[in-house]
């Protein structure tokens, strides 16, 4: 089994995190932390499943981490936040209806840009697998040896 970490979404999202919670979760399988090449996967929670509403239940109880252990996959769990003001998001949903902008469903959408930047900060460049190493509450990329 691996380890669960938090990362600062605002710091790693390239300024596109206004509708996101401060922290995201990252699950790192033991094999990935010990140097085996690993891939990355993004798991988006549903409405009312953001961390402020359910703690880490979505992250720890869906079975995704067991699948990640078996397949050498680092899992990024980005987190939204509830908002009762504009942009209105009272159930902490990902933007699937346009509450952030009309670009919500394409790569120019703010949430897509934020998650893409987070993944780049953890993951790889050019599609090549890398090793992942956890260092405190930050994720540090270490190159293949």
Predicted regions and their residues:
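Short beta-strand element of the alpha/beta-hydrolase
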Residues: 26, 36-48
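Catalytic phosphate/metal-binding cores of nucleic-acid and nucleotide-processing enzymes, i.e., regions
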Residues: 17-24, 59-62, 73
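Long, low-complexity intrinsically disordered regions of secretory-pathway proteins
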Residues: 137-145
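N-terminal cap/lid segment of alpha/beta-hydrolase-fold proteins
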Residues: 1-35, 107
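Surface-exposed acidic, glycine-flexible loop patches that form ligand/cofactor-binding
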Residues: 27-36, 64-68, 124-131
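Hydrophobic/aromatic beta-strand patches that form the interior of the parallel beta-sheet core
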Residues: 5, 42, 76-78
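Cap/lid segment of the alpha/beta-hydrolase catalytic domain
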Residues: 49-57, 69, 76-125
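Loop/turn elements at helix/coil->beta-strand transitions in domains of secreted/extracellular proteins
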Residues: 35-40, 70-76
